[in-house]
């Protein structure tokens, strides 16, 4: 999984515990030997476990980890536990819980979307965009990968993807061949993706032979027409669908013959419920 630096882990912790735990201190519980455990309430995919472990170790807590990143577990499964002083465990509690809940939620949605797509087309690929909640992209990426998903692009420097907002600034916004030719010259090692807003644009793009045409917010009927036009043109161009694609409708697009699905839906999934219990050491 992804590497998280000490600074990133510190940021997670300091957001919540920059002045310690007032309640634990006021109750005089700080030095009491205690044990903490984290359980997944519902069956599903686990994500964020490696980050949770590192967060605990940052607080000099040495956890016992029972599952792996991306593993499917049954309801009520124990994910990790640790022993330590009550003040350390209470400082770790909420940060670790939130990382696990949010990561598991993203991973669960991703896994369900992949399953729905692959039930129709085993070659289907679910790729998540950079349209994540601000400051959560790395956590989200880690969760998507844990669930078996792919990353569409992490940032602007990774792929060549031409939007209408790029073309609006060109002297000839519809010179598709000129756009593709220039990109091949300037970035010869990268695949070229053009995004089509409608079928007219799509048909024009076919003549330029990009590697991929991304169909943005196309209805099922429009996708069907696009596939027909592609077949008539006899072009070896990959079609992807983006904009509004989610776990509820991905199978319908897959039935048409699409196998590359671009989505940000997993980032907005409901968090999974992680039960946390802190008790005195026996």
Curated annotation (Swiss-Prot):
EC number of the protein: 2.4.2.-
Alphabetical UniProt keywords: Glycosyltransferase, Transferase
GO biological process, one term: quinolinate catabolic process
Matches recorded under CDD domains: modD_like (cd01573)
Pfam families in the cross-refs: QRPTase_C, QRPTase_N
GO MF, any single term: nicotinate-nucleotide diphosphorylase (carboxylating) activity
Origin superkingdom: Bacteria
Family matches, as SUPFAM superfamilies: Nicotinate/Quinolinate PRTase C-terminal domain-like, Nicotinate/Quinolinate PRTase N-terminal domain-like
Entries under InterPro entries matching the protein: Aldolase_TIM, ModD, NadC/ModD, Nicotinate_pribotase-like_C, Quinolinate_PRibosylTase_N_sf, Quinolinate_PRibosylTrfase_C, Quinolinate_PRibosylTrfase_N
A GO-annotated cellular component: cytoplasm
Family: Belongs to the NadC/ModD family.
PANTHER family: NICOTINATE-NUCLEOTIDE PYROPHOSPHORYLASE [CARBOXYLATING], PYROPHOSPHORYLASE MODD-RELATED
The protein's name: Putative pyrophosphorylase ModD
Source species: Pasteurella multocida (strain Pm70)
Taxonomy of the source species: Bacteria, Pseudomonadati, Pseudomonadota, Gammaproteobacteria, Pasteurellales
């Amino acid at each position: 999984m992804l590497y998280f630096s000490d600074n990133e882990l510190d940021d997670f912790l300091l957001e919540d515990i920059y002045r310690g735990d007032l309640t634990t201190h006021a109750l005089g519980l700080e030095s009491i030997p205690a044990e903490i455990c984290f359980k997944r309430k519902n069956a599903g995919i686990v994500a964020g476990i490696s980050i949770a472990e590192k967060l605990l170790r940052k607080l000099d807590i040495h956890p016992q980890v029972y599952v792996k990143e991306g593993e499917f577990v049954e309801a009520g499964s124990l994910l990790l536990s640790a022993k330590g002083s009550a003040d350390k465990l209470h400082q770790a509690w909420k940060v670790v819980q939130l990382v696990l809940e949010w990561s598991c939620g993203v991973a669960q949605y991703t896994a369900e979307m992949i399953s729905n797509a692959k039930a129709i087309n085993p070659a289907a690929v679910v790729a998540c965009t950079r349209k994540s909640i601000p400051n959560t992209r790395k956590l989200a990426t880690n969760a998507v990968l844990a669930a078996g998903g792919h990353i569409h692009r992490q940032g602007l420097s990774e792929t060549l993807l031409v939007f209408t907002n790029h073309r609006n600034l060109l002297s000839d916004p519809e010179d598709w061949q000129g756009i593709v030719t220039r990109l091949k010259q300037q970035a010869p090692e990268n695949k070229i993706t053009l995004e089509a807003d409608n079928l007219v644009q799509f048909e024009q793009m076919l003549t330029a032979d990009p590697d991929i045409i991304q169909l943005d917010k196309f209805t099922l009927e429009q996708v069907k027409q696009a596939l027909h036009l592609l077949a008539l043109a006899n072009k070896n161009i990959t079609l992807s669908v983006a904009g509004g694609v989610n776990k509820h409708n991905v199978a319908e697009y897959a039935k048409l013959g699409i196998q590359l699905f671009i989505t940000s839906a997993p980032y907005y999934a409901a968090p999974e419920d992680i039960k946390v219990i802190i008790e005195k050491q026996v």
